[in-house]
Amino acid sequence: MADGDIEIKAGFVDTDLDDRKLTMIDDLNNPLAIVERVYLIWWHWADFHLHVISPHIDTITPAIVIEPELIPGSNDHEFVYSIHDSGSKLSTSKSQDMFSAGMSMCKLFYTIEKMVYILVERLKSGGVSMEAEVQIAFAGHEIAQRKAFESIINLPYNVVVTNFDPGIWGEKYLQNVKRLADKGYGYPPESPRKIYMHPVSSGTTARK
């Protein structure tokens, strides 16, 4: 009986492997499935880039790597990824955590908030007034660009994103903002926001 059981189980294994092979072949021949898989991979190491078009900002070569800083009054570091600072361009990505962060965008969103803070400090140090038009451009993962746009439109500065069309998502976002405000929850806080400087407890570190 034991030998028979082994043969039956082996048959199930062979059938399962055959089914997997057929599924894999079908996926390889399906352009939509390939695009979906590529998008999923990109989501795991999503990148984001912020370019300052106007006013002119000198390029830094080689780029400076801004690492997470120690939060004052604690032993924790900022909950952000490394930022590559090229002067007129700021870049980051989830690549260092791509296997542990999964599809979570929390840490990337916090990093984007820090990038917006760096942008504002750069405008201040350059003597740019809040009324002067500042032109920037985005690159990277679509969801990261949406987060950056949400932060930018809540700045006191006159910052214009030249290459991002919020489209239907933007309309829904504004509708949700108004709906929450009408219910008494208020409007989103003004940017830049230093939420990345709050210590992240051990129970929430998985949100990378």
UniProtKB/Swiss-Prot annotation:
Its main location: cytoplasm. The keyword DNA repair does not apply. The keyword Transport applies. It is found in: Cytoplasm. GO terms for cellular component: cytoplasm. One of its GO terms (biological process) is protein transport. Disruption phenotype: Mutant is differentially attenuated in diverse hosts. Inactivation of the gene causes a minimal defect in growth in the human monocytic cell line U937 and the environmental host A.castellanii, but mutant is severely attenuated for intracellular growth in mouse macrophages. Mutant appears to assemble a fully functional Dot/Icm complex and exhibits wild-type levels of contact-dependent cytotoxicity. Keywords: Cytoplasm, Protein transport, Transport, Virulence. Induction: Constitutively expressed in vitro. The T4BSS is a complex nanomachine composed of several subcomplexes. This subunit is part of the Type IV Coupling Complex (T4CC), a subcomplex composed of the DotLMNYZ core and the IcmSW-LvgA adapter subunits, linked by the C-terminal tail of DotL. Interacts with DotL, IcmS and IcmW. Interacts with various effector proteins, including VpdB, SetA, PieA and SidH. Component of the Dot/Icm type IVB secretion system (T4BSS), which is used to inject bacterial effector proteins into eukaryotic host cells. Part of a subcomplex which recruits effector proteins and delivers them to the core transmembrane subcomplex. Is a critical subunit for binding a subset of effector proteins. Recognizes more than one type of binding motif. May be a critical factor that confers host specificity. This is Type 4 adapter protein LvgA. It comes from Legionella pneumophila subsp. pneumophila (strain Philadelphia 1 / ATCC 33152 / DSM 7513).
